[in-house]
Amino acid sequence: MSVKRVFLATKKDLTIGAVCDVKTKQASSYKHNHVTTQQGLAGSREVALSAIVNLMKGFDTKELEAPVQVFCVSSVADMINNQSYKYWLISGKKNDGTDVDANEMKLWKEFHKLMSKNGMYFIFKSLNDANFRGTPKFNQAEIKYNKFYYDWAWSAIHKIYPQGPATPDMDFGIVE
């Protein structure tokens, strides 16, 4: 029997993460590429959702003794937890009235089908929830465990897609 946690960081066309077994303290890396035509937040959301669908398809739920905590980008975690993706499935439209991208809609339909079958085995949380700061009054070992994999996932992504400078160059070419 096992207790699993999944940490998924997404940037551009790539999701990198770790699938961890809390009891055995073992983890395996996870990498998923997905090409999207969408830009910005919508593109990131589609790439992350593609990774989640791919992961859920291959997940063996028979050996679990607790639901799998999946930490992913907040744009996906929020839509799942608020169940707002169901509005998209029914109407085919976003809140602003524009059509949902066809590829993303296909992924949401597949996700919904997987959740209908195995939804009780998965809990979705924002990856930022794994990054506790300070010393909150929670289980410190669990906080360190989550923080380790949060940091690991983002550092793996940033090796491929480096972050911008720590302090942005604010020189806008203004000559006085």
Residue spans for each PLM region:
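Glycine-rich loops and low-complexity Gly/Arg-rich segments
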Residues: 30, 93-98, 151-152
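Short, low-complexity, polar/charged sequence segments that are solvent-exposed and flexible
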Residues: 24-26, 88-91, 143-145
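Conserved phosphate-coordination/catalytic loops
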Residues: 41-46, 50, 101-105
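RNase H-like nuclease fold core
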Residues: 1-47, 57-59, 161, 171-176
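Acidic, metal-ion-coordinating active-site neighborhood of RNase H-like domains
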Residues: 9-11, 133-137, 141, 149
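Hydrophobic alpha-helical segments
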Residues: 44-48, 52, 138, 150
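Charged phosphate-binding loop/patch that engages nucleotide di/tri-phosphates or the phosphate backbone
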Residues: 127, 139-176
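RNase H catalytic domain
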Residues: 53-139
